[in-house]
């Protein structure tokens, strides 16, 4: 679900329905009087019209709910796109933040930046991530995944070569033992 959809739901929550914007009509309440055994209680005459209005109201609510569910199922079938960016200068970070503000996921590879520039850019992206309620996860030594709030990233299975392995061997190479 996109940020725009969440914002629309938030606005819809605080707006009044069309039915509640109609002027309030005071309905006549039946008056109960002591009844003799020979008299039958009188029923109000407008009761059938009240139930017809209630049925119409229920039908319109049901129709609106069905449309909402149809829209949600269409949103669920939308494909998720992850943009891959290779920033070369600090100014490229603003484009990445614009993508995040547009509720898109971005995979950022800092391989074409110096370490100082990459840290500066990463600080900027981290601040924007907190403001926009996004997530920033490190997925490789120079790669980060920046996602909006509605995307969950599970990176517990990803092991970075710098964390667990020491020595001069790659991810799937065996260490040469000196004898």
UniProtKB/Swiss-Prot annotation:
Annotated Polar residues bias: 34-55
What are the subcellular locations of this protein?
Cytoplasm
Pfam families assigned to the protein according to its UniProt record, in alphabetical order: SepF
Tell me where it mainly resides: cytoplasm
InterPro entries named in the record:
Cell_div_SepF, Cell_div_SepF/SepF-rel, SepF-like_sf
- Give the domain of life: Bacteria
Listed A to Z, the keywords are:
Cell cycle, Cell division, Cytoplasm, Septation
Q: Region labeled Disordered — which residues?
A: 18-55
Gene3D superfamilies in alphabetical order: SepF-like protein
What's an example GO cellular component term for this entry? cytoplasm
How this chain assembles, per its entry, is: Homodimer. Interacts with FtsZ.
Report the sequence similarity comment from the record.
Belongs to the SepF family.
Outline what the protein does: Cell division protein that is part of the divisome complex and is recruited early to the Z-ring. Probably stimulates Z-ring formation, perhaps through the cross-linking of FtsZ protofilaments. Its function overlaps with FtsA.
Show the HAMAP family listed in the entry.
SepF
The protein's name: Cell division protein SepF
């Amino acid at each position: 679900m996109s940020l725009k959809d969440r914002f629309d739901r938030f606005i819809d929550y605080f707006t009044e329905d069309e039915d509640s914007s109609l002027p309030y009509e005071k309905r006549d309440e039946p008056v109960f009087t002591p009844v003799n055994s020979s008299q039958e209680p009188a029923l109000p005459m407008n009761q059938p019209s009240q139930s017809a209005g209630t049925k119409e109201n229920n039908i319109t609510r049901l129709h609106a709910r069905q449309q909402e569910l149809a829209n949600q199922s269409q949103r669920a079938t939308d494909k998720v796109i992850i943009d891959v960016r290779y920033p070369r200068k600090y100014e490229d970070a603003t484009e990445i933040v614009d993508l995040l503000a547009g509720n898109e996921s971005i995979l950022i590879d800092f391989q074409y930046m110096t370490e100082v520039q990459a840290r500066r850019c990463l600080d900027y992206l981290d601040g924007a991530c907190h403001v926009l309620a996004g997530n920033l996860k490190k997925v490789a030594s120079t790669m980060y995944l920046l996602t909006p709030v509605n995307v969950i990233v599970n990176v517990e299975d990803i092991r970075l070569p710098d964390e667990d392995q020491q020595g001069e061997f790659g991810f799937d190479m065996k260490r040469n033992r000196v004898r």
